Amino acid sequence: PGTCSCLRHGENYDDNSCLRDIGSGGKYAEPVFECNVLCRCSDHCRNRVVQKGLQFHFQVFKTHKKGWGLRTLEFIPKGRFVCEYAGEVLGFSEVQRRIHLQTKSDSNYIIAIREHVYNGQVMETFVDPTYIGNIGRFLNHSCEPNLLMIPVRIDSMVPKLALFAAKDIVPEEELSYDYSGRYLNLT
């Protein structure tokens, strides 16, 4: 297939659908914009990865100490898209309202992604998978995670919270990411 005109500004993924550059030591990530409905490329364009959805088999399982968890049933190479952390996209006031209504026994799955855009401005996206979500809600925290969360934009400026393999992941390994937004506890 020919080269998509969307890729003239840089390529997000390699020929194996792996995130091209997780950054220096996996600490940072560049913004990812995938082809969208306005793009003339085919559905097979290599700049369409997250929008294709799950490509691996997973299992929700009961962990020994953390409640439910998610593990892969097959090998996942470093850089591959694993799953989206999907849920309701909320405004800040709704996030505050929901947190205020929670009791100490309620779980909180709301995640805040802060992106530094320009002139010191910060763009925030809040996602709550409590009522509407997918398998991403079963991911547990780890200070040594095997996933990295990257905001990916497709047909909207509201990003999809995409989780990519930060390292090669073997079958039966529990999938995890750092809830703080850091990777491997590096600042």
Predicted regions and their residues:
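Active-site-adjacent structural elements in folded domains
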Residues: 19-21, 158-161
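Short glycine/serine/proline-enriched coil/turn segments at secondary-structure junctions
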Residues: 157, 184-185
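A generic structural signal for residues embedded in beta-strands
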Residues: 84, 176-177
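Exposed beta-sheet edge/beta-hairpin loop segments within beta-rich domains
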Residues: 163-169
